[in-house]
Structure formats: C-alpha cells, structure tokens
Amino acid sequence: MPVIRLPDGSERKFDGPVTVAEVAMNIGAGLARAALGGKVNGKAVDTSYLITDDADLSIITDRDAEGLAIIRHSTAHLLAQAVKQLFPDAQVTIGPVIENGFYYDFSYKRPFTPEDLQKIEARMQELAKRDIPIVRTVMERDEAVAYFQSIGEQYKAEIIGSIPADQEISLYTQDDFTDLCRGTHVPSTGKLKAFKLMKVAGAYWRGDSNNEMLQRIYGTAWAKKEDLDAYLHMLEEAEKRDHRKLGRQLDFFHMQDEAPGMVFWHPRGWVIWQEVEQYMRNMFREFGYQEVRTPTIMDRVMWEKSGHWQNYHDNMFTTASENRDYAVKPMNCPGHIQIFNSTLHSYRDLPLRLAEFGSCHRNEPSGALHGLMRVRGFTQDDAHIFCTEDQVKDEVADFIVMLYKAYKDFGFNEVLVKLSTRPEKRVGTDEAWDKAEEALAVALRQNNLDFELQPGEGAFYGPKIEFTLKDSLGRLWQCGTIQLDFNLPERLGAEYVDEDNSRKHPVMLHRAIVGSMERFLGILIENYAGAMPAWLAPVQAMVLNISDGQADYVSSVVAELRKNGFRVDSDLRNEKITYKIREHSLQKLPYLLIAGEREMQTGQVAVRTRKGEDLGSMPLSAFIERLKSDVADKV
C-alpha cells in the first residue's frame, strides 16, 4: 500500500502500485488532463511511471519549467517522426532540448530546404492532432542494438555503445516511430500544441569535423499558442535590432573574413566605446581602484605556473621567438598577481584593487563566433581585489553597489542574481568555503537582493555571484560576476605580511561589471535598437541648414555646441530639408537642429527629437541646457 506524499504536505494511500497518471486523476480530472509528467522523490518520470513504494510526488504541468522542457523534448521526437515518414532514407541521431526550443540532427543525402521544413512542420501538426499515445519500453542492450541495426539506424546503435553499462536502455514509441531516449515525454502527441520549425544548419556528428556533416533542424515549442506568438514577435524585433546589421547601417563597426572574431571599430562606434570605458574608469576611481596595464604576450612559463597552459591551451593563441614559447593572454589575472608580487605587502595595504581594460584573445571555434557577442579579441573591464578573508563581505557589498549603479545608468533596471557554491572537487578548507559563501550571501542580503542559490556550481577555486541583465525584449545576458579565488594567489606565490608577522596568501576576487566590452556594446546596441541615449550617442545633434544663406550661422551653432562639450555635426549640402531630415532620422540621432532664415535672425534653432517630436524653435542656450540635462540624467 504505497503512501504518496504531495507538495502541500497531504498524503494519499493506494491499495497497490499506482501510476503518476492515476494519482493525478485521484487528485482531480483537471490535473490529470494537464499532467505532462511527474517528479517521484525528485526524479522526473513519465505519467505512466509505476510507483510501488511510499514516495514524494509532484505532478508536472505546463506551468512548470520542467513541463516546458518535456514539451520541447517530445516535440523533437515529433519532428523526427515526421522526417522519417517524409524522408524514409534519413537516419536519426540526437535531438536535445536547448534554450527556447530544440533541435534534431539527421543524416541525409542532401540538405533540407525551406520547402522541406514546411512539409515537415505540416506533418508534425497532423501527428499532433492524432493524439498518438507515447509508450516507454526497456530493452536489453544487445537487443536494442540489434533492433536499431535492423531498421537501418546505425547512429542509434552507436549511441547505445556509449551508454554506461549500469544504465537501462529505454525506448519511446509513437505509432510507427521508435526512438532511443532517457525521457521524460508527454503522454501523447496531442499535448504538443504550439511549435514551429525555425531553420536548418549543418553540424558534425559528435561535434567532430572529421565525422559526417549532418542536417540540424531547429525548432521552438511552447505550452500555448500565445507564448509561441510572443516568442516569434520577440524574434522579429530582435532581427530589427541585430547589432551586426545596425553596426553597418549606423557606421559603428564592421567585421571581415581576414580577421575572424576581431572588430574594426569606425569613428562613431569608437565614440560609444570610449564613453563606456571612461564611465567605468570614473567608477574605478570613485570606488578606490588603481588602473594598471599588463603585457598582452607572456612566456609559457607564466601560463604553466597559472595552470592555463595545461588546462586552457587549446583556447590560447601561441607564438614563438628566439627559442621561447609565448601565449597571448586569454585573461588578465596572472598579470595582476605579478604586479601584486612586485612589492612586499602588509595587511595594512589590503584591500588592494587593481583594474585594467585588458585586451585578451581566445581561440574560439569559428562556428561559435557571432558578431560582437562572441569574438576572439576582446577587452574586459577587469579588476582583481586582493584582500583578507575578513574583508571579503565588505568588498563584495561595495562591488554590488558599484554594479547596480552602472547597470541603472546604462538603462538596465532588472538584474537576476545567482550564487554558486562549492563543488565536490575543490581546493581550500571547508572552513574557508563556509566563510566565503556566507560572506557572499550576507553581502547580497545587505543590498536587499533576492538571489538563486546554485549548489555545487561554483568553480573549484571558490564560490561566485553572477549577475544577468534583462534587456528591452526580455532577453537575458549574463555580464557581471564576482568570483572568489583561493587557488591562484597560492599557485603564483602572492603573499602579504599579517599582523602576527606571518606570511599569508590573500583572497583574490575576480570581478567584472560589463565583462567583454565588445559584447556589452552589442547588448547596448540591441537594447536601444541603435538609438543610443544622448550621453552615449556618437553624434548628439546634427545641425541642418535650409538654404546656403544659413551656412555661416550653422557653423557658429556647431562651434558653440562643441565648446560646451557636445558631439555635434552639420549637413550643409544643397538638398531639400525634408530629404536631409529623413536621411539623418535613419541614423537614430537624439536631435536634429534646423536653422532657417527666421532662426538665424533670432539666434534660435528648430528642434526635432529622434522620435519625430517637433519641439519648435528655442534659443540655442535653452537647447544647450536641455542636452546637458539629458546627458546628466543618462537619457
């Protein structure tokens, strides 16, 4: 007689073994209809799972994150079934859940076309409407291999060979299609109501370029049609905001094949960069950081000491000269420790905060590169704080204040926070970890921040806090981080003299707010759709004349604005004013100033905002005050 304990603390007793679906029906018919799976003693299972002993059970529906993952996983199988029906010669390989959807890789004699995707999606809709039951079975390993070989699915047979011997081999069948899978799956295809195939791309089997190129079909799936429609609308908006397109359109930057993963910054884009960098530099000064500069290339001996040569070598660019091996730095921390080590420090010198806009390079795979968001050459607002264990809490608390001020000024008001704690394999004593984790948690609470705890997700050398921004489209971007490090200071011999005259290793805090400058500028461009706020805009105002008679007046207006520290340009071309207004409006400039005969005679300018608002004519001094206010208020 199993006793089932539910999340609300109540219990239900059954006369014999009972499935998750039967428990859901016992609770209520509505819950039974909504059930997608269950969690038995914390493990996700199908609704057909048979519970034989006392257990904790929660029913998974589409309101749960696990429910959405089950929907997406099951939709990947629906895709595979449709492909096999339409293209019987295709072989199925793997089909995992990814962010916002899923993909499935197929081996086929030719690439799938957009027309193929339309047919496949239509077949998926038909299969979903049929509400086909999805049935789980377990096979012996040899039997499963023989089965997949008999139906020509060699990839599935190969996958079984890589499954650990102590894991059972489970298969899921829906009508004429059977796939190898651990689960969990929806009880029937009728639960899959909102999905769309997005694109097809190439992908190597097992990610190895020596293997066959497969066809990867990407899709998205949601619990409700409204959710799918909202996601597709967000993608449309994101397409309009694509920083790669805006970078060229607004003359900010470009990238080219001769320098993969590197950025060519144009004058306008470099202005934005400089404004962000100078803002962060001012923050460094305000919060007591000292700016430094470390070499871009260092001898392999340094990287061997730090452990990068052994553990990160494939991601490093290396070179040789005069029989010595060198590496281009992928990160700044070893260099900062060298500066710390150059002087003998007392405990009175701590905390010591060293900051650098450090130029780093990482040999990212070419397929992973994506505009400014994933590059090979990047600059970080990197800083390292050398402190004692007792100083960690206050340093982290101050960093959080600094970070939130910066994000607010850049226009990000919603920040998600995660605290990652000790993994199984780690350096340092339990006492040190206890103290460090508590310091981070207290610093977060001190700043009244809610945070998600991620047990076991810290690095082997210390716990960390991650800060994730939500942009204007609701997308999440992990940017800020502060990471404790018990390991590297000891490994590279960083020491200070304590009160008792003994030598101790400092705690090292790795911290960044914007992270990669390139990536952060990409995020800013997309967040603002290229319409940068006045304080960041490369051109804050464009002054236009109506006829040649105002050319000198326009020049004097430009001179006065520049004297007040503004970034201003003029357009004196002999074109219709409507043409010039339209052209410069496409450049998303904060203000257009129009000078006609009347404005020239009265010392005024006619002001238009980039939103198309006509503010009318005003004295130049009034506009100067308006723009000063915009810049000061970071709008």
From Swiss-Prot:
It catalyses: tRNA(Thr) + L-threonine + ATP = L-threonyl-tRNA(Thr) + AMP + diphosphate + H(+). SUPFAM superfamilies: Class II aaRS ABD-related, Class II aaRS and biotin synthetases, TGS-like, ThrRS/AlaRS common domain. This is Threonine--tRNA ligase. PANTHER family: THREONINE--TRNA LIGASE, CHLOROPLASTIC_MITOCHONDRIAL 2, THREONINE-TRNA LIGASE. Coiled coil: none annotated. InterPro entries: aa-tRNA-synt_IIb (IPR002314), aa-tRNA-synth_II (IPR006195), aa-tRNA-synth_II/BPL/LPL (IPR045864), Anticodon-bd (IPR004154), Anticodon-bd_dom_sf (IPR036621), Beta-grasp_dom_sf (IPR012675), TGS (IPR004095), TGS-like (IPR012676). It is an enzyme of class 6 (ligase). Catalyzes the attachment of threonine to tRNA(Thr) in a two-step reaction: L-threonine is first activated by ATP to form Thr-AMP and then transferred to the acceptor end of tRNA(Thr). Also edits incorrectly charged L-seryl-tRNA(Thr). Gene3D superfamilies: 3.10.20.30, 3.30.54.20, Anticodon-binding domain, Bira Bifunctional Protein, Domain 2, Threonyl-trna Synthetase, Chain A, domain 2. Its cofactor is Zn(2+). Residues 1-61 form the TGS domain. The lineage of its organism: Bacteria, Pseudomonadati, Pseudomonadota, Betaproteobacteria, Nitrosomonadales. The keyword RNA-binding applies. Belongs to the class-II aminoacyl-tRNA synthetase family.
